């Protein structure tokens, strides 16, 4: 049986759970990961922490789950042991308005042992994959201009971290 300890960083009532909440399975470093993520994203908080009781996959009294919000999105992290690992089959997408925002998230999420990957992807130091994407890509897609989209996508395929100015230049055929 698990015990619950509220560790909310804000006052007030706990929000109603989202219909769909992302659940992240960590080996034994969920607390470190959650503290890192909450430090990276604005409007983020740890809402609740549960600890293992007499039964479960972890030693009694150690952190089992952590409910947290990242910029308004609810997540739960689990210290579940080494059974499962993250893969690129699942990633979290961060939509960015400016190059400054892209640079910020890229640096934070790929740093300290993370890995830069092609096409705006990074794998953080915990093995979780993220896509750092400029909103400009969606704007071009919504325009419906196939030639412009093709030119932009060719540029996308050559980049690791997205460069909005470079994407715009490519999309315009310059």
Language-model features, listed with the residues they occupy:
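Core segments of cupin and vicinal oxygen chelate
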Residues: 24-72
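C-terminal cap/linker of serine protease catalytic domains
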Residues: 11, 144-174
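Vicinal oxygen chelate
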Residues: 26, 30, 40, 70-74, ...
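Residues that flank catalytic or metal-binding motifs in active/ligand-binding sites
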Residues: 18, 64, 88
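Short loop/turn microsegments at loop-to-beta-strand junctions
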Residues: 21, 63-64, 117-119
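Basic/polar N-terminal segments that are highly enriched at the extreme N-terminus
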Residues: 1-18, 168-174
């Amino acid at each position: 049986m698990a015990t619950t300890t509220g560790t909310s960083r804000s006052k007030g009532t706990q929000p109603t759970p989202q219909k769909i909440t992302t659940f992240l399975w960590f080996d034994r470093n969920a607390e470190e990961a959650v503290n890192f993520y909450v430090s990276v994203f604005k409007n983020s908080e740890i809402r609740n922490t549960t600890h293992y009781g007499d039964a479960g996959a972890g030693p009694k009294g150690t952190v089992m789950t952590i409910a947290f919000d990242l910029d308004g999105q609810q997540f739960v992290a689990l210290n579940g042991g080494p059974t499962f690992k993250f893969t690129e089959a699942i990633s979290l997408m961060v939509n960015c308005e400016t190059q400054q925002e892209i640079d910020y998230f890229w640096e934070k999420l790929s740093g300290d042992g993370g890995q830069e990957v092609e096409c705006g992807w990074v794998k953080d130091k915990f093995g979780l994959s993220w896509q750092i994407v400029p909103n400009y890509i969606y704007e071009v897609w919504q325009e419906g201009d196939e030639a412009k989209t093709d030119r932009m996508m060719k540029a996308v395929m050559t980049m690791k971290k997205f460069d909005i100015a470079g994407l715009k230049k490519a999309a315009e055929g310059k």
